[in-house]
């Protein structure tokens, strides 16, 4: 957090049918519906999150990610980072407070990889869902589905990874936690963090700009991941891979698709990092084991199905 960017705050996803998407994210993943707006967007959050929302669903003709937002420490920090982005050569769009319900002024920019990100300082504080602030119980007893704990990260595909890396590290204060290096020594995947997490956002090289691989939600235990797999089967939800373990980050994971084809992940565990740790490096020739630690064989669908 050396530049004042604290954490992932929200992601806006495009879905083909709002009600079927809502049934997926609310009833299967277990997010809580918090609000709707005049544009028809639906706002959701996981139960441990203290701000009003972390996921926004927007009905559209094509699936994918509109943007990902990061929360900064205060308005002064937002102003400073805005100027830093301008000085770096980024084009800036300022979105007024209230355009997302309960969210303050947002500053949006596009990365060299073709993805849109935004920074904001203020969002309505609603507290952890279903718990009192004083003497809180361990968890709410009326959670649904997979009982997602928090929105954790996004994995994105695009080109110009080195330029994107420079923007995130030099301007926004991220650090490199893990990477994949090809035979020429070129970084083809980068896992960037603001915190002790294995990653807050990750990028994999792709010749096409602005592609979305997955949005990820944290669960508490391996038993919860297995239970998520049961729910995927019970609901005939399209599965991608898992349950399994990653070599990269060592998280225990399962991947599946929402009704629009956007890939989701739920996971538990994984490595921790501090900024004095050296980046963990995997070799591209061992990518099968890096992604699927048990099978050690690449799933072509996992690499090529993007929105």
From Swiss-Prot:
It comes from the Bacteria. InterPro entries: Catechol_2-3_dOase (IPR017624), Glyas_Bleomycin-R_OHBP_Dase (IPR029068), Glyas_Fos-R_dOase_dom (IPR004360), VOC (IPR037523), Xdiol_ring_cleave_dOase_1/2 (IPR000486), XylE-like_N (IPR054560). Pathway: Aromatic compound metabolism; benzoate degradation via hydroxylation. Pfam families: Diox-like_N, Glyoxalase. Keywords: Aromatic hydrocarbons catabolism, Dioxygenase, Iron, Metal-binding, Oxidoreductase, Plasmid, Repeat. SUPFAM superfamilies: Glyoxalase/Bleomycin resistance protein/Dihydroxybiphenyl dioxygenase. Its cofactor is Fe(2+). Fe cation binds at residues 153, 214, 265. Residues 7-122, 150-269 form the VOC domain. This is Metapyrocatechase. It comes from Pseudomonas sp. (strain CF600). The lineage of its organism: Bacteria, Pseudomonadati, Pseudomonadota.
């Amino acid at each position: 957090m050396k530049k004042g960017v604290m954490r992932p705050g929200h992601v806006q996803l495009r879905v083909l049918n709002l009600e079927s998407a809502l049934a997926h994210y609310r009833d299967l993943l277990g997010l809580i519906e918090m609000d709707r707006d005049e544009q028809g967007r639906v706002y959701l959050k996981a139960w441990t999150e203290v701000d009003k929302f972390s996921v926004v669903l927007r009905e559209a003709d094509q699936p994918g990610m509109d943007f990902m937002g990061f929360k900064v420490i205060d308005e002064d920090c937002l102003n400073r980072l805005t100027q830093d982005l301008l000085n770096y050569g980024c084009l800036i769009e300022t979105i007024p407070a209230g355009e997302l319900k309960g969210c303050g002024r947002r500053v949006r920019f596009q990365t060299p990889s073709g993805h849109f990100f935004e920074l904001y300082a203020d969002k309505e504080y609603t507290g952890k869902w279903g718990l009192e602030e004083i003497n809180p119980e361990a968890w709410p007893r009326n959670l649904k589905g997979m009982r997602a704990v928090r929105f954790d990260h996004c994995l994105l595909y695009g080109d110009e990874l080195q330029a994107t890396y420079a923007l995130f590290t030099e301007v926004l204060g991220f650090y490199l936690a893990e990477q994949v290096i090809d035979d020429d020594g070129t970084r083809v995947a980068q896992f960037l963090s603001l915190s002790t997490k294995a990653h807050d956002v990750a990028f994999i090289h792709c010749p096409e700009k602005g592609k979305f691989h997955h949005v990820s939600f944290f669960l508490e235990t391996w038993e919860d991941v297995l239970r998520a797999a049961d729910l995927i089967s019970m609901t005939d939800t399209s599965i991608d891979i898992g349950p399994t373990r990653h070599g990269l980050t060592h998280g225990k994971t399962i991947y599946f698709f929402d009704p629009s084809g956007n890939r989701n992940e739920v996971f538990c565990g994984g490595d921790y990092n501090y900024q004095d740790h050296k980046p963990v490096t995997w070799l591209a020739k061992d990518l099968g084991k890096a992604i699927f630690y048990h099978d050690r064989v690449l799933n072509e669908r996992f690499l090529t199905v993007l929105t």
